[in-house]
Swiss-Prot record:
Origin: domain of life: Bacteria
Record's keyword terms, sorted: Cell inner membrane, Cell membrane, Cytochrome c-type biogenesis, Disulfide bond, Electron transport, Membrane, NAD, Oxidoreductase, Redox-active center, Signal, Transmembrane, Transmembrane helix, Transport
Stretches assigned to the Thioredoxin domain: 440-583
Signal peptide: 1-20
Gene Ontology cellular component list: plasma membrane
Family statement drawn from the similarity comment of this UniProt entry: Belongs to the thioredoxin family. DsbD subfamily.
Transmembrane segments: 185-205, 237-257, 261-281, 302-322, 344-364, 375-395, 405-425, 433-453
Reported function: Required to facilitate the formation of correct disulfide bonds in some periplasmic proteins and for the assembly of the periplasmic c-type cytochromes. Acts by transferring electrons from cytoplasmic thioredoxin to the periplasm. This transfer involves a cascade of disulfide bond formation and reduction steps.
The species this protein was found in: Actinobacillus pleuropneumoniae serotype 5b (strain L20)
Protein name: Thiol:disulfide interchange protein DsbD
Keyword Transport appears in the UniProt entry: yes
Amino acid sequence: MLKRFIFLLVGITLTLSAHAGLFGNDQPKYLSGAEAFAFSATPKSDKQIELNWQIADGYYLYKKEIQVTPQNAEIQPLAFPAAENYHDEFFGEVEIFRNQLTLPITFSAEQANASLSVHYQGCTKGFCYPPETVTVSLDGQQAVDSAQNVAKNRENSTASQPLANAPKAEQDQLAENLANNRLSIFWFFLLGIGLAFTPCVLPMLPLLSAIVIGNKQRPNTFKALLLSFAYVQGMALTYTLLGLVVAAIGLPFQVALQSPPVLISLAILFTILAASMFGLFEIRLPNSWQQKLNAMSQKQQGGAFGSVFVMGMIAGLVASPCTSAPLSGALLYVAQSGDLLTGGLALYLLALGMGIPLILITLFGNRILPKSGDWLLKVKTAFGFVMLALPVFLLSRILPSHYEPLMWSALAMVFVGWLISVIPTQGVIKQAVRIVLFLTFAVASYPWANLVWNQGNSSHSAQVSNHLAFERVQSLAELQEKLTASQGKKVMLDLYADWCVACKEFEKYTFTDQAVQQKLAEMVVLQVDMTNNSAQNDELMKHFNVLGLPTILFFDESGKELTQSRVTGFLEANQFLNWLNQL
């Protein structure tokens, strides 16, 4: 039983790691500018219009880039809501908006054909969008003057080959998100089954089964199934209501839950919860609360559907030391999602998973129950490691991107090391499992080994130029001339802008790498400065269907773009080198 559960936990951990982009080189999928920052303008009165941005999760707008310029009108000073302070490695302390921004505009004077020119620009981790300029009339009608036209041209593009790394169509992206959400939701069901095999719950299942059935003669199998199912549904109702309440409360605070202080606090809280799973201390309801709930439960009579249902509801409130930490973590996850459907369904599946063993024991008796022992404590400890994945995921959202693989690597090494220590050395199968775990440990240590290797070669790398020597091009016509003149060599075109954080990361961490520079020496390396978002820049973006920056294009020896090799978003040096080697 322990081995099966360990394999389940390893699967969960690998899924979390893959979702967080642990060691993979897959290109991330980015939304279009119109999807990431859905803009609308709504007239509120003859003298006021309301600008609204619905900002996708994980994306943000820079406050300093939001500018409103009146045409044939005068407006009162802009009244921004409180912004989030954000530390950027390259731009220092900046103010940003996440999730939603509403900006009321009040006119103090206006003439005929009055309008507003609204300028804004935003980013997400590893990717930035060109500045947007929208013209808004007083009746709320709007016309996009700049970069959003690129997204529209993308949809109408007649390019001969699809872009492998371009974002998917909106309906495809939605379908993929729904599929991913369904998968993540069902992990709560597996988590519930796992919680039933903790040392605080498993030994109580036979007693609980007897209480559910009651003191009368054992009912037939069908009635026993219905009674146990009623108990589980009562417990599930309590958990579902908890999920709905927490999700509803979480909705107004989604902006706060994105700020670094809150994310750091949540990471510390999850670490404390994980420590409780390691047995350092216990988290439970106050004794007085538990005694009152237990007294209420004892007043109910077993064997009756209504009483059994109420008993299940009360049991859902009595959080044991083994289940309170994972339950708290699940509730915090639900609060951050702010989704009522997700919140209710996730906690329902958690309770349903916890109730499956109870139903089986009620039907088939204690003979199917695994024997208690030290393995129960190991299951609890394994849950502690799963809990530690949450702080890593939270901190990866605010730390520089090169720290994320190091954190996942450290967690994986500690987890695998613990698995090696608890698996006995006797037996051929167990020895084979240990060998596989040792190999897994070696793979998990790769980011740290790569870090040490790069530091060890830093003195030698210093002899190489710190900055890659790009040849600048200004327009599409000039680029085509360069491609014609570069016959016989591959060409790399880097689209760069001063406002692009990930472009600066490429410049600092990737293009300064010795191995990358040696590989690029085999090519012609060109660069376009997109900082001013000029008409020439816009022409390039439309021609190549570029969504945002950084974007790096590659051309073969004949000057034809290698569309399958386009890079969107930041890649570290080793990832980018692997990408170059596949050209």
